[in-house]
Amino acid sequence: QRGSRGQRCGPGEVFNQCGSACPRVCGRPPAQACTLQCVSGCFCRRGYIRTQRGGCIPERQCHQR
């Protein structure tokens, strides 16, 4: 999927005009304090989680790493 500026999203990602500034990352605890601000860009699809390398994988694979 492409964003408004022609940005190409990777596998398991979707472009969102107003996504979280603090996405969940596999192997890291959730952010304790995250400001409620809109960030546009590529975000993991529902049921996926960001890896520490930057890609998105199914959440069920996160616990296997």
Swiss-Prot record:
CDD domains: TIL (cd19941)
Cellular location(s): Secreted
Disulfide bonds: 9-42, 18-38, 22-34, 26-62, 44-56
Gene Ontology MF annotations: serine-type endopeptidase inhibitor activity
Protein keywords: Antibiotic, Antimicrobial, Disulfide bond, Protease inhibitor, Pyrrolidone carboxylic acid, Secreted, Serine protease inhibitor
SUPFAM superfamilies listed in its UniProt record: Serine protease inhibitors (SSF57567)
Sequence ranges assigned to domain TIL in this UniProt record: 9-62
Biological-process GO terms, alphabetical: defense response to bacterium
Predominant place of localization: secreted
Site (Reactive bond): 36-37
Alphabetical list of Pfam families matching this protein: TIL
Residues with PTM Pyrrolidone carboxylic acid: 1
Family listed: Belongs to the serine protease inhibitor-like (TIL domain-containing) family.
Function according to Swiss-Prot or TrEMBL: Inhibits chymotrypsin and elastase. Has antibacterial activity against Gram-positive bacterium M.luteus and the Gram-negative bacterium E.coli.
Protein's name according to its UniProt entry: Chymotrypsin-elastase inhibitor ixodidin
Species this chain originates from: Rhipicephalus microplus
Lineage of origin: Eukaryota, Metazoa, Ecdysozoa, Arthropoda, Chelicerata
